[in-house]
């Protein structure tokens, strides 16, 4: 790292660290950005030592600039870093990366005007290529330098490692900058495997060459002295043209950039191959429930590079699908950030989502909300007790169960009243609420008949319930409603008799249910208002009419 970071002196380093990454942003350039740029240049087979001088930075910018339109975000970041470093070497005061790019563009326009003026003064064309691999020798002739083995080796390694993944296209564009059709064919011939893909590439080149011949027909008549023939599609592909003809077309006035045309055809074919090797659509890229957001973004942009769409469409895909296809946890965070959030802000906000720390934090927040809501309910008096009051089967009192009852144990079954077995072993389906040994002045208790037992069924007609808990009848009311002929005693749970009562001027048999504080009557019509009610016990539920203040 020390060798890479030594490209700047002390004063230059101070100016470098004052420049912001984006206008109005807080982050500034650091040494790590220079180290990162050096490593990326090594990947592109470019000497990272060129970063030490402004001239070297200018050469790197000239090599990277033609690939910006089809390059990846990584390539653009590298170009921005080198442009900012060039301004630092030239002592050009800039505050952020955008100003550095504006300064570079301004200098390029000035140099282009100077070159045009010089070409007009000397009578030479301003479009003459001075870039590698076509260079001008000492005699002023344009000569070709063969593509270096280092460049070919870098290209072969990319094909072997990436196997026509989306990043192969910008890599090819960077390595083939300024190359002639012969150089491009040399690069294609070095690919040993993937012959099916290479055959697809040849078919695409033949189609584009035929389209070129259709759009550029040969002019009739002889060629003027000193003029070159017009290139055909096969000439551009390098199959029917010599190296000297290719150099002549590229350096002619006006020039015919056969190398750039052929490279555009090759990139078109590579796009088809990448689409075949990467059949996944951008619509299918979704974040897994436990997948880190960073890995999801890597997969998203890798697939986006293989999409054949304009930059406007890709920008729309990024703004819409990146948030829409995230998992629920990340989607909640991204929607809270808003549509103007940058990718850096998204990755920072979603860092750690899905891990144990995030889950513990979400669980703690949920428990806190539940606790607060329960506290508010209890403070407002909305808290209702969920458990029912227990009742003892032995003595009939509430507040304890038979196991803890201090009263003498009742003999027999607590369900049917017979001796010889306990309640847990009782086979009686319907509870027998009546005891045969009870004697009352109004009549003897008896068991339900089969007809009365069916009255407990939900399908049976409605019964009448006389509520006794909220009636304190006056004598006048008693005369109007009818007087009960019996004063009900306090009867325990085991003593539920059927007695004869007089209500509404009618004599009826009624079941006294002291536990529920209700009197149940059957087949009687009473005047006044009533409301529907469901009552039930061990035998089931029945529908009744409830009359109050009877």
Curated annotation (Swiss-Prot):
GO terms for biological process: proteolysis; symbiont-mediated suppression of host gene expression; viral translational frameshifting. Specific enzymatic cleavages by the viral protease yield mature proteins. The protease is released by autocatalytic cleavage. The polyprotein is cleaved during and after budding, this process is termed maturation. Proteolytic cleavage of p66 RT removes the RNase H domain to yield the p51 RT subunit. Nucleocapsid protein p7 might be further cleaved after virus entry. Residues 7-31 are annotated as: Interaction with Gp41. One of its GO terms (cellular component) is membrane. It comes from the Viruses. Residues 14-33 are annotated as: Interaction with membrane phosphatidylinositol 4,5-bisphosphate and RNA. The record marks 132-133, 363-364, 377-378, 432-433, 440-441, 488-489 as: Cleavage. Residues 277-363 are annotated as: Dimerization/Multimerization of capsid protein p24. Residues 106-128, 444-464 are annotated as: Disordered. It catalyses: Specific for a P1 residue that is hydrophobic, and P1' variable, but often Pro. The active site is at residue 513. A lipid is attached at residue 2 (N-myristoyl glycine). This is Gag-Pol polyprotein. The lineage of its organism: Viruses, Riboviria, Pararnavirae, Artverviricota, Revtraviricetes. The gene is gag-pol.
């Amino acid at each position: 790292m020390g060798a890479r970071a030594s490209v700047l002196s002390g004063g230059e380093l101070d100016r470098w660290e004052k420049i912001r990454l984006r206008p109005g942003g807080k982050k500034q350039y650091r040494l790590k950005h220079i180290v990162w740029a050096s490593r990326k240049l090594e990947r592109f087979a470019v000497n990272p030592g060129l970063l030490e001088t402004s001239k070297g930075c200018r050469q790197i910018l000239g090599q990277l600039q033609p690939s910006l339109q089809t390059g990846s975000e990584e390539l653009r970041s590298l170009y921005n870093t080198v442009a900012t470093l060039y301004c630092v070497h030239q002592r050009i005061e800039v505050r952020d990366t955008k100003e550095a790019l504006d300064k570079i563009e301004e200098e390029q326009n000035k140099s282009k005007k100077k070159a045009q003026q010089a070409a007009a003064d000397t009578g030479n064309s301003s479009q003459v290529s001075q870039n590698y691999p076509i260079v001008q020798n000492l005699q002023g002739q344009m000569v070709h330098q063969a593509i270096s083995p280092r460049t070919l080796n870098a290209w072969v390694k990319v094909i072997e490692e990436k196997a026509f993944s989306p990043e192969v296209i910008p890599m090819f564009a960077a390595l083939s900058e300024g190359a002639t059709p012969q150089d491009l064919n040399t690069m294609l011939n070095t690919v040993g495997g993937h012959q099916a893909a290479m055959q697809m590439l040849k078919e695409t080149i033949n189609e584009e060459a035929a389209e070129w011949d259709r759009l550029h027909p040969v002019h009739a008549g002889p060629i003027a002295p000193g003029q070159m023939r017009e290139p055909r599609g096969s000439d551009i592909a390098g199959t029917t043209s010599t190296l000297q003809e290719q150099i002549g077309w590229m350096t002619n006035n006006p020039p015919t950039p056969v190398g750039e045309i052929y490279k555009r055809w090759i990139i078109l074919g590579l796009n088809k191959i990448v689409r075949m090797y990467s059949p996944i659509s951008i619509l299918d890229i979704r974040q897994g429930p436990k997948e880190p957001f960073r890995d999801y973004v890597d997969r998203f942009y890798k697939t986006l590079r293989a999409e054949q769409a304009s930059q406007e469409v890709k920008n729309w895909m990024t703004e819409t699908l990146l948030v829409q296809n995230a998992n629920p946890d990340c989607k909640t965070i991204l929607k809270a950030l808003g549509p103007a959030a940058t990718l850096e802000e998204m990755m920072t906000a979603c860092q750690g989502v899905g891990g144990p720390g995030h889950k513990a934090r979400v669980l703690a927040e949920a428990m806190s909300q539940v606790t607060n809501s329960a506290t508010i309910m209890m403070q407002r008096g909305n808290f209702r007790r969920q458990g029912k009051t227990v009742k003892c089967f032995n003595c009939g009192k509430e507040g304890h169960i038979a196991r803890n009852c201090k009263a003498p144990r009742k003999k027999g079954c607590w369900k049917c009243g017979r001796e010889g077995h306990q309640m847990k072993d009782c086979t009686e389906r319907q509870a027998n609420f009546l005891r045969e040994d009870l004697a009352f002045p109004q009549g003897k208790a008896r068991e339900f008949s089969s007809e009365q037992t069916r009255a407990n069924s939900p399908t049976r007609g409605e019964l009448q319930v006389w509520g006794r808990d909220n009636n304190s009848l006056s004598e006048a009311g008693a005369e109007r409603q009818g007087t009960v002929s019996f004063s009900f005693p306090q009867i325990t749970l085991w003593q539920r008799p059927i007695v004869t009562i007089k209500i509404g001027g009618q004599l009826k048999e009624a079941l006294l249910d002291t536990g529920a504080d209700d009197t149940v009557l059957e087949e009687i019509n009473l005047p006044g208002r009533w409301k529907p009610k469901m009552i039930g016990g061990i035998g089931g539920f029945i529908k009744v009419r409830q009359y109050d203040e009877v």
